[in-house]
């Protein structure tokens, strides 16, 4: 399903279920299998067994083969965090980036509840979390969180912008991270756009990601993008008025005159994100609004299965 074809569809729950079915069709096993796995003990290796779980470091020290055994929790606990900040409301006439993040969270929520895994939903902007639910695995909990996502799906660009009003009480990102349990799964759907003049916000984000990894949490980072405009600056040769969706400041520029400098800056920014994810062991994937969501999610989890 392409977002441009379904953006005006109001029955969000049906959309999420249909996208989930398309996503599952592209996989051969549960996409969340193996997340809550913890090392338990060693046992001697028996000839003829698979060598997959041999502890090679222990072999080098003792010259004996031992198998690493793992305990897998029966129920996964997950946190779905969706960025609803101003930069996600692009393009202004269709808010495709925000809708991709919302639909992605809806699909994953359905998958988790289907497996009887508990999850919480969080919505955040540049000031922190506007909404965070408790962790539950019931059908009623799923329907409640789908309702929250549906409200944002069906909002107009204007009402969506009003959601991030400064008079709403926010929970800080730091506080939310401290409430995440050990070995939980955290899925973040965001464009990862920060004001380049305010480096503290970006540094704080990666500090919190490092804290989650220290707690042995798995992090799946789906970076939502409008590649044609944001990565390529493909806006034609006419003058364009650029509007900051978070501060509403404006500037009029000729795209082809700044394209070279902009693309160099964007490449450097993406390289930095990729490097941070690599260093922290975060599974990172780009999600373009021009691609079907099922294709994006399938590719994301296939990539993960090859890495783990």
Give the positions of each predicted feature.
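N-terminal juxtadomain amphipathic helix
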Residues: 51-53
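A positional/architectural concept
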Residues: 33-36
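Exposed, interaction-prone extracellular/peripheral surfaces
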Residues: 1-31, 44-49, 58, 67-103, ...
């Amino acid at each position: 399903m392409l977002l441009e074809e379904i953006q005006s569809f109001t029955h969000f729950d049906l959309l999420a279920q249909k996208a989930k079915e398309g996503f599952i069709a592209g996989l051969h096993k549960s996409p969340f299998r193996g997340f809550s796995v913890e090392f338990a003990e060693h046992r001697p290796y028996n000839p003829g067994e698979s060598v997959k779980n041999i502890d090679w470091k222990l072999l080098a020290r003792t010259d004996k083969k031992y198998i690493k055994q793992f305990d897998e929790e029966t129920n996964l606990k997950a946190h779905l965090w969706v960025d609803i900040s101003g930069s996600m409301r692009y393009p202004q006439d269709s808010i495709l980036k925000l809708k991709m993040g919302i639909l992605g969270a809806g699909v994953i929520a359905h998958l988790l509840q289907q497996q009887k895994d508990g999850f919480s939903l969080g919505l955040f902007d540049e000031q922190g979390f506007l909404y965070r639910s408790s962790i539950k695995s019931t059908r009623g909990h799923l329907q409640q969180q789908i309702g929250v996502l549906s409200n944002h799906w069906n909002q107009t660009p204007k009402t969506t912008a009003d959601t991030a009003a400064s008079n709403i009480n926010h929970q800080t990102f730091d506080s939310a991270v401290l409430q995440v349990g050990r070995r939980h799964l955290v899925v973040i759907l965001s464009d990862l756009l920060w004001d380049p003049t305010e480096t503290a916000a970006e540094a704080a984000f990666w500090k919190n990601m490092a804290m989650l990894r220290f707690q042995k949490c798995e992090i799946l980072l789906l970076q939502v993008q409008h590649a044609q405009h944001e990565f390529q600056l493909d806006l034609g040769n006419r003058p364009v008025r650029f509007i900051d969706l978070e501060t509403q400041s404006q500037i009029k520029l000729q795209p082809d005159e700044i394209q070279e400098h902009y693309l160099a800056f964007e490449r450097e920014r993406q390289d930095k994100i990729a490097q941070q994810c690599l260093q922290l062991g975060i599974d990172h994937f780009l999600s373009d609004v021009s691609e079907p969501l099922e294709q994006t999610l399938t590719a994301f989890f296939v990539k993960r299965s090859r890495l783990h």
